[in-house]
């Protein structure tokens, strides 16, 4: 027995395995690993990418208040408390003008903390290693087996070649395209999928935020968005045609289109600067039900994908990791697997609430461009939703609860 993070943890061989095998070092896997170590549950994490890649991978940075409470309450929030910024206002721009919703003062009175996901991941990696955790970067997993038995295993491929890891449970936190969800036999889970028919050109630019709040611009040429990331980096989105080559947009074209859709001539100029990263994001959603099969439990994007329209993905990952950590801890220390059996039933209502609001946001921000009767009808519906959000305090309180909550 050795001491780790104030708890006694059984230590297994360096390659043989652990009680909980975690695949993937994103927010779900890292929060899960840290919580298990703190609870005295032996675990290890394998991650296909390098540490450098994981720690610089830019992702959404809006953390809900409940997520912050989980991180801070478990000793994982020092970085976000020191460097995160409270954000409680969002702005909508339309042809009728601009209106701000101070959602941090509406509903439950909760705001977001802006803290880039790559910074959070770096914090979680450092804390996991500080607690003595076993984290193996550059180690893809090609197969997971034994899931319907007592000793599940996975085949890992490290720098010295392939080897098998065995454990009592496997946590699949390796994303939608990861190995774990592909190992579930056909017919054992039901996938609910929706392709929203909307694509965004996602841009990370090397300029300070031009606006004090998240700003959603609805324009006849398509949606545009402004989201702060750090004091020197800003995220922008431009709605584009599905299948667009991100490289086909020159920097001049990007900024000209942002100026047009954000109505810079009317509301003030944007801060132009270099485009550091660009990618086309197709807005899609899927949910697996159940989120488990045998000894395999999925969390984060491995269990379901949510569109970025409402910034819920990382928050759902953290909440699922907390639920799973509690269930593993009870199973290991008390021999009671009831919470594990209920894992999907516990998580799915929260996930579907987030999916519903994300779907509503997509309808709020997008509408067809055509001049046919149906397109005109859908645009009028969208405009009515925006006007209702602008004028109805009941709608504003409901929006705040869903936008900032989980």
Could you describe each region identified by the protein language model?
Residues 1-20, 35-39:
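Extreme N-terminal leader/targeting segments of oxidoreductases
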Residues 3-14, 311, 326-406:
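C-terminal helical "tail/cap" subdomain of flavin- and related membrane-associated enzymes
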Residues 23-38, 124, 279-360:
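Conserved mid-domain beta->alpha element of the FAD-binding
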Residues 37-59:
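Glycine-rich FAD pyrophosphate-binding loop
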Residues 126, 133, 143, 149-279:
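Conserved FAD-binding catalytic core of PHBH/FMO-like flavoproteins
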């Amino acid at each position: 027995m050795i001491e780790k993070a104030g708890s006694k943890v059984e230590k297994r061989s360096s390659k043989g395995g652990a009680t909980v095998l975690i695949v993937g070092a994103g927010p779900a896997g890292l929060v899960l690993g840290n919580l298990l170590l703190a609870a005295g549950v032996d675990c290890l994490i394998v991650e296909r990418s390098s540490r450098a890649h994981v720690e610089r991978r830019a992702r959404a940075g809006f953390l809900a208040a409940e997520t912050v409470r989980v991180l801070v309450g478990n000793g994982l929030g020092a970085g976000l408390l020191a460097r995160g910024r409270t954000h409680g206002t969002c702005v909508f721009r339309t042809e009728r003008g601009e209106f701000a919703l101070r959602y941090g003062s509406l509903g439950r009175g909760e705001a977001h903390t802006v803290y880039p996901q790559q910074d959070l991941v770096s914090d979680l990696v450092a804390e996991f290693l500080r607690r003595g955790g076993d984290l193996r970067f550059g180690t893809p997993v090609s197969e997971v087996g034994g899931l319907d038995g007592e000793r599940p295993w996975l085949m890992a491929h490290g720098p010295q070649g392939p080897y098998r890891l065995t454990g009592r449970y496997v946590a699949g936190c390796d994303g939608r395209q990861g190995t774990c969800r592909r190992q579930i036999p056909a017919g054992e889970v039901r996938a609910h999928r929706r392709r929203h028919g909307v694509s965004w050109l996602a841009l990370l630019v090397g300029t300070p935020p031009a606006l004090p709040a998240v700003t959603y611009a609805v324009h006849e040429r398509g949606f545009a968005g402004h989201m702060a990331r750090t004091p020197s980096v800003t995220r922008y989105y431009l709605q584009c045609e599905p299948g667009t080559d991100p490289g086909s947009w020159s920097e001049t074209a990007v900024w000209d289109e942002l100026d047009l859709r954000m109505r810079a001539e009317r509301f003030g100029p944007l801060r132009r600067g270099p485009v550091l990263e660009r990618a086309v994001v197709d807005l899609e959603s899927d949910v697996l039900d159940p989120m488990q099969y045998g000894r395999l439990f999925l969390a984060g994007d491995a269990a379901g994908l949510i569109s970025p329209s409402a910034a819920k993905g990382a928050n759902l990952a953290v909440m699922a990791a907390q639920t799973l950590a509690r269930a593993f801890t009870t199973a290991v220390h008390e021999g009671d697997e009831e919470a594990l059996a209920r894992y999907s039933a516990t998580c799915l209502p929260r996930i579907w609430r987030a999916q519903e609001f994300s779907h509503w946001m997509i309808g709020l921000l997008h509408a067809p461009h055509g001049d046919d009767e149906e397109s005109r009808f859908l645009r009028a519906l969208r405009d009515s939703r925006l006007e209702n959000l602008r004028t109805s305090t009941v709608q504003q309180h409901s929006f705040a609860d869903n936008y900032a909550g989980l």
